[in-house]
C-alpha cells in the first residue's frame, strides 16, 4: 500500500511538469504573437520561446518578459490543480492527521513557560529542554483520563496547581497536593485553606453551607434550601426513590427551623431529628413551634403520616447523607465558615478538600454539597469589575463523588461566570457507571480539551480511535494469471483506515499522551513530570517555610472538658503554692452570693478562653512569690514535670489577676 500524501519526490515532479507546460505556453505565444496564420503554423516549434531568451540572442526583449509571465502563471495554475485533485482523492475516505506544533502555537494552545496562565497538560519536548507547554487556550473545561500510576498527578494536577493564575478548589484525595503545592500557592498571594473534616489531628478549616442561606432574605431561603437538599440528599437504591422527595422536604423544614432558632448548621438539623421518642409527636411539636409557613406545612403533613412511613422518610434522609453529621468531627468542621464563596472571584484563593481514600465514600455527600453549592453561588450573578479571577474546580477521582446534577447542568453555562472544570477519571467507563448515556455525552461534548494516557479498558481506546478519525491511502493489489507466467494485473484504489487503531492506544508508551482539542487536529505530546522538568522543578523547589496548616479544631465536648480541667488546675495550683482558699482571698467586703456570682462569671470566661485584661502579672513575680513560700521552683523539679508546672504557673498568674481585680489595693501581702 502506498500512501497518497504529498512527498518531496512527487512535489518535484509536479514542479517540473508545471514548468514544462508553462514553457510550451510561452512558445505558443512567441510563435503566434502576430496572429494565427499559415506561415506561423508551419514554423511552430516548442523551442520558440528559447529563441527569444537573452541566453540565445544576448539581450532581453518584450517577448521574453511576456513569455516569462506566462510560464509563471501556467505553473501556478497547474500546481494548484494537481493539489486540489490530490486532496479530493485523499478526502474521499477521511482527512485525519496529527497536528503540527506550529499551528497549535498559532492557535494559542502551546505556550512558553512564562506565558502560562491556565492548566498544564503536556510538553513538546523532554524535561531538560526549553519547550512549549500545552494549556487549555480558549477551552474552559478539560477531561483527563488516565489509569492508576499513569502520571496524571505529577503531570497534570501538580503542575496546574503550581502555575494556575486564579482560584482553585481541589479535591485532594491523598493529601499530597496540599503538602506539595500549598506553600507555592501561598507565596504567590493565595489565601490557602485546608478543609479536612476527618483529619486525625483535627487540623482543618471550616465551612458551613447553611450560613449562605441564613444570610439571604426570608423569601429566598426556601428555594435555596430546596437546592441544598437536592444536592445533599440522594437515594441509595431503587427502594429509596419513592421516599426521596419526602426526605428532602424534611431536610428543608429542619434547615428553616434551625435558622429560626439561631443554629444554622446541618449538625443542628441532625440533632433535631435524632431526638428520642415518636416522630409524629416531634413533628407536631415542631409545627407548633415554627413560625416559618413552609416549615409548618411540611411538619404538619409529616405528623399526619403513619409511623412506618415516617420511619422510611427519616431512614432515607439519614442514609441519603444526613447521617454523616453524626460524626462530631464533621459537625465541628461545618459549624462555621473560614472562607467566603463570594470572594473566590475577587481574590486568589486555594481550597484543598483533603480526604483519605478510605474516607472518600463516607464524606462524599459533604464534598458533593460543597462543590455544587459553590457552583450555584457563582452562577447567581455575572462577575463584577473587581472579580477578575477564574475559579478552577479540580476534581480528582471524580467518579467517587457520585452524581453531581448541578455540575452536569452548569458545565454548559458556568464558563460565562468565570468557572472552569477539570475532571480526572481512570477510564470512560467511570462516567458510564455514574451517569446515563446522555449525561456522559454531555461531559464529553463540553470538555474542549481531553487528555488520554495509556489505558487498558475496552471503551476508552475505541473512543480515542473514533474521535481521531480515518485517513485516506492508496491500496495497491497485484493479481497473476495462471496461464502465463509473467502476465499480472495491478490495481490501485483509495481506501480509509484509522489514524490510530485501538490496539495502538493500548501500546502507547509511558512518556507520551494523546490530546483531543475541539476544532483542532489530534496532538501527541510528551508527559510532564514536575520533579524532572527544569522549569517546574525550579518552581517546586523554591517553596520555603512551614505548611499553612490550620489550628487543631476544638470539639464541643473538648471545650466543656477543657473548662472543667482549667478550673481544677486553678484550685490545684492555688493549694500547691499555699495561697489558701480562693473564696477567702477574693471575699473582701462582699457577700458570699455576690462573690460567688462574680467568680462564676469569671470562670465561664476562663472556660471559653477569655481572660480578664485589667491586670497583668509577670511569671517571674509569681515564681518569686512561690519561692518565698517554700515552693520548689521549676528548675528544681524533674525535667518531665517542668512543662506542666510552667503551665500551672501561667494559670496562677491568671488567678492572681482575678484576685487583684476583686479586692482593694493593699500594701499588705497575702498571708
Curated annotation (Swiss-Prot):
Q: What topology does it adopt in the membrane?
A: Multi-pass membrane protein
Name the residues that span the membrane: 12-32, 60-80, 153-173
* Intrachain S-S bonds: none
Instruction: Report keywords, A-Z.
Output: Cell membrane, Conjugation, Crown gall tumor, Membrane, Plasmid, Transmembrane, Transmembrane helix
- Report any Pfam family annotated for this entry: T4SS-DNA_transf
Report the GO terms under cellular component.
plasma membrane
Q: Where in the cell is it found?
A: Cell membrane
- Family per record: Belongs to the VirD4/TraG family.
What PANTHER family does the entry give?
CONJUGATIVE TRANSFER: DNA TRANSPORT (PTHR37937:SF1)
Q: What is this protein called?
A: Protein VirD4
Q: Which organism is it from?
A: Rhizobium rhizogenes (Agrobacterium rhizogenes)
